[in-house]
Amino acid sequence: MLFRSVTNCASSSMTEVLAAQVGVPFYRSKVGEANVVDCMLQHGALYGGEGSGGPIDPRIVLVRDSIGGMAQVLDLMVATGKTPSQLVEELPKFIMIKDKMALSKEALDRSIDRLKDALGADSVSMQDGVRLA
C-alpha cells in the first residue's frame, strides 16, 4: 500500500513539505481528531496528526497516541544514533501565525478575494476557517 499522510488544516506545512520530498500523497482535514481519522480512512492513510503533537498510527490505534509517538521517536533515535535535538535540526523551519479578525461577511468576502488575487487561489484554503500557505 502506498504511504499516505493526513494532518488537520490548522497544522503547519511541515508534514506537507516532508511528504512532498519523499513523494507521499498528503491530505488535510478539518480540525478535530475525528476529522483527521475520517480523512485517513477515506484515503487509506498510514499516518496522521492532530494538533499538540498528537500522532495517529492506525497500526496502533485510530486516536491520538502520544505514547506510541514517543516510542516511534525513540526507535528513530536508536536507528540513527541521533539525539532529539539533532533530529529536530534536520527538519525544515516554519513560522506559523494564528490570529482572529472581526469582519462583516462582506468585508471577509472582499478580503478573501484580494488574498486569492495576491497569493493565488491555491494558497488560500477555506476548508475550516481561512488558511494561507
Regions found by a protein language model. Give the residues of each.
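Conserved PLP-enzyme active-site core in the AAT-like
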Residues: 1
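Phosphate-binding and adjacent anionic-ligand microenvironments
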Residues: 4-133
